[in-house]
Amino acid sequence: MKLDHLVLKNYRNYAAVDTTFSPEINVLIGANAQGKTNLLESIYVLALARSHRTNNDKELIRFGSEFARVSGQVSRQSGSHQLELIISHQGKRARIDRIEQPKLSQYLGHFNVILFAPEDLAIVKGSPAGRRRFIDMEFGQMSPKYLYNLSQYKTFLKQRNAYLKQLKYHQAKDLVYLDVLTDSLAAFGAELITARAKLLETMSDYAATIQQDITKGRESLHFSYQTQVDPSLRGDSEQVYTALGEMFAKQQAREIEQGTSLVGPQRDDVLFIVNDKDVANFGSQGQQRTTALAVKLAEIDLMKDQTGEYPVLLLDDVLSELDAARQTHLLKAIQTKVQTFLTTTSLEGIQKEIIATPAVFKVDEGTLARA
């Protein structure tokens, strides 16, 4: 999978961009606050129809403009496709090959990207909510079914929590309606837990090999999926559905008392276990960085495994955060097989013997030019 051509109109600090890219390594070089991260963000937005930096789409529109447009020509095994997002103050519109998509969910999955930014180095020791967002964003790209189940689950969770609050404050009395919401939540929750268990197991295997390679066999790594359902049941969605139903029944009185759902995958987490210890609490900073790198590289392999194609990789000033050994491993892992966009303030320190002939672009005050 490659991004061949990108067109921007009124996006952040870019009035207009129209450029083609190398199918291998593309380096965006420039001083700070010139628009390097904005350009990477636009590629991310083209893929996922949302920013990784803000939940307010209006921030993506250039100051004083009515709309922003992001358009790209993407090459896949199935052929070349034009993707387009138009972001206005009224909302977003998505097109594939000039055909309007009624739902954003029908747009997603046509272009897959993986972003690696300095803040991702903290993924192993960040919050459970951050790890859940990470899981959902990546797995949702790989599987339309996962994305659908996640969307449905969030809808029913919101409705159920609102109704639990009504029951708490005696504004509602009908427990039959609560049972209907609970059954739907258990059904979609079971699908999510089963999918997460399967995908995390595969991703863990990839990450374990990478961690061993980086550390020359000194460190073992595996993922420990933390969910309320017993591990022996997670491979069967029907058994997970039954288990969730039993837990909801047991917790119903407490849920009404607290006005919120206490059971379900919205409480999941993933622990990264290095040499039999939770690296977030007991690992060194070096181990945490190696683990974060292994997780990100495992994402690439998992996406290839699930979709049949490598994603596009976005590296936002991350090379400066890695020592020479980790930088070398990252660059060797991606060279020639993964189209990559990386930002940097200087080419100094980048492993030039690995990136022999990158396409270099100069970013300066919202303009992009081939260097």
UniProtKB/Swiss-Prot annotation:
Its main location: cytoplasm. Keywords: ATP-binding, Cytoplasm, DNA damage, DNA repair, DNA replication, DNA-binding, Nucleotide-binding, SOS response. It holds the Pfam family SMC_N. The keyword ATP-binding applies. It comes from the Bacteria. GO terms for cellular component: cytoplasm. GO terms for biological process: DNA replication; DNA synthesis involved in DNA repair; double-strand break repair; SOS response. GO terms for molecular function: ATP binding; single-stranded DNA binding. ATP binds at residues 30-37. It is found in: Cytoplasm. The keyword Cell membrane does not apply. The RecF protein is involved in DNA metabolism; it is required for DNA replication and normal SOS inducibility. RecF binds preferentially to single-stranded, linear DNA. It also seems to bind ATP. NCBIfam families: recf. HAMAP family: RecF. Belongs to the RecF family. This is DNA replication and repair protein RecF. The lineage of its organism: Bacteria, Bacillati, Bacillota, Bacilli, Lactobacillales.
